[in-house]
């Protein structure tokens, strides 16, 4: 579905064009009309363009009306258009603009309510992130929250073909309370609640084996621990119905879809997972990260560890830079080969190394309990 057109030689998105207007396809030059947002069964289809004459060629699928035109919308344009259409559908009473200035910052999409409402405040500022990883997320979010606007920070994996998951909106009201240094004039009880508290005390208490075994659920998979390594992506330790321990990676792929892969692990794999986490911290996010000149042109491998696993399955985990010449994200991939090779790959955040190290410690403890 096209999301980018030309009107009087200017680039336009579907929300910027009134219904009934004809725009030009930047790829094939043919005319396109506006298709309003609609629901196809339980699926939301965002406002988009459609070739009037079916496009050049023989057709690209039932109902597409885009023929053989090979032009694809630039991804950032498409993300903004889909976010606009979704907000327009969900909040028909609000005012929505593309790239409207909000006191010094320009969100990709800005929604404003007629009156502030809970929990979103004055409105919602949308940042559709595609490849621009240099933006200071904390500063941008703080700017919008300080002005009583909620924030939807949308990355590529939040989008499906023609819809977007807006469940992760960071709403204003939990962040609208004053900090403890701005409580003059409040009742004494409120000021007391905001005072500095004593630091929490943390203690490590071994779990008795009998308690561990009380959670045995014969015939079921049991999750032992799960740690986040990216937004909507995690690593997990589980126990199978036949008593084996597994390590897995899983991520959300889009609206209601997910992908995961599990591999069996043994006690010797604890050290391998821990050393992989150390490599990830140093080589991916630390001082030992290689310069572009030291890297392969594409998919430069930073670390690889082979798991012992099971006799009939080969399993390993890797960390790599897809595009070493740019400010590339780090991709962690879990591999599994029996007859065919399976894999799950995801771009990870800097906290992934620490969380994988924590999982390695928990896995070590799980094996100790199993032995006892």
Swiss-Prot record:
Residues 55-70 have a biased composition (Gly residues). Residues 49-72 are annotated as: Disordered. This is Uncharacterized protein Hlac_3024.
